[in-house]
Amino acid sequence: MAGIRTIEVDCSPDTDDPEIDGPARHFTFIINGVPVFARGANLVPQSMLPGSVTPQQDHDLVRACRDANMTMVRVWGGGVYASDAFMTACDEYGILVWHDFMFACIDYPGDDEEFMSEVRTEADYQTRRLANHPSLALWAGGNEVQAMHQAVWNNLNPGPWGSEIFDEVLPEAVRRNSPTVNYWANSPATDVDTDPRVNGTRAGDRHAWEVWHGADVGAGTHEDYSSPAEAMHYHRYSYDTGRFISEFGIH
């Protein structure tokens, strides 16, 4: 199956923003020049034994996404890479794919050359394998690695925690093997000049776990609510001003 399309991510300043502490930034997928609202879900492994998932199951899952009026699926970085059958079904049904590399929630030994060699090999293989799927809209460096590092260390300074992976190794693999596909350093990630918080509301994508935890993870503290129950109420989603909520934290 062939597909001719352009996919861009608009991260330009939001001129309609009230400019509190400077303008926020858009995070919008532009398909063939047309902004597309991303409606979808995160894909976690369908089975504890990934090899048991059949091509027909992948096809049926993507068809269900289409029937649910989804436009995008995010392949979550704490699971497994999408199969060829899954990606082909996304091509067939017109479902865009945000695909994390398989790194999640912890620091990685960027100073271990044997490990880094494995990372380069994996990134090269996966970007080549999936390069020809028109549904592939974006590669993200991983899931919550930057967010967790910032939460613990209060910075994103370069160092042997994996920064080289997300800032150099992975984007180089995408540029080399899949140059028409967008790259985003992590999920969530930010434009630090606009919003230094990795999981903030003014730039980039964010993971909205406030409802699950009833606590602040970037969109306001529980003290803004009259009770813990109110802080965890699903109505809280309607107050979230995140630019692009790529994970809602409800299973």
Where are these regions (language model features)?
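Active-site-adjacent substrate/metal-binding segments within catalytic domains
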Residues: 1-106, 115-138
